Amino acid sequence: MGIKSFKPTSPGRRQMTVLTFEEVTKDKPEKSLVVTLTKTGGRNVYGRITVRHRGGGHKRKYRIIDFKRDKDGIPGKVAAIEYDPNRTAYIALIHYLDGEKRYIIAPYGLKVGDIIESGENVDIKVGNALPLRNIPVGTIIHNIELIPGKGGQLVRAAGTAAQLMAKEGDYVQVRMPSGEIRLIKADCRATIGQVSNLDHENVKIGKAGRSRWLGIRPTVRGSAMNPVDHPHGGGEGKAPIGHPGPLTPWGKPALGYKTRKKGKASDKFIIRRRK
């Protein structure tokens, strides 16, 4: 794992850094575990933009990831660590003893040839998956379920990790990467270890074109728009905002405004809010 920088042969190269991909051992994905991915350009079924700044980018094939980790009692061998264009973490190709192949999110430190397992009472070892009630307090975990059997939904991005803080009856306390401490059902599964690709946060994009390769379109300032497009738009020359404070494109306060819905059902599971 490392970061590669370049000589300033052009303005775009001057600040650019890329990952060295030292952990990646295979360049072509397993054919049986990929499906075609249709681009949406951030539009919904009616053709309206629902997510701004999306569109273009390199073609991708979706890798089918096993988030459930429900193959109990059958050990699997790590056959390869691969790059996945659909996520920031690396993925690991697992060959199970019964012949099945699956992809999982690769934890930091997992290597080709390692044996991983999932089940009720497997060893507390990087890459193993088991219910939260059987994981010791203080253990670093990732790929955490919110509903038993649904598959991991939390802590899946590159370099992230959560920590099991305490156990209270049918629930356990987990400290999330954001600092939030929340209750999760003890029957939910999690995987031991931290997510791979720790250096992802240190990569500098370097130039606008590289964002376009990733399918990210430019973010235009509201003050550069027309009044019909943004509350900050319009005016002659560089006009002030014209409001007591900055607003979102939909007219809501942009600063200091709590966007979480009040009285949400999951509020009772949050012991301490993120900072």
Curated annotation (Swiss-Prot):
PROSITE patterns given in the database record: RIBOSOMAL_L2
Coiled-coil stretches: none
Protein name as catalogued: Large ribosomal subunit protein uL2
Subunit organization: Part of the 50S ribosomal subunit. Forms a bridge to the 30S subunit in the 70S ribosome.
GO cellular component: large ribosomal subunit
Ranges of Basic and acidic residues composition bias in the record: 264-275
Name of one Pfam family that matches: Ribosomal_L2_C
Superkingdom classification of source: Bacteria
GO biological process, one term: cytoplasmic translation
UniProt similarity note: Belongs to the universal ribosomal protein uL2 family.
Record bears the keyword Ligase: no
GO MF: rRNA binding; structural constituent of ribosome; transferase activity
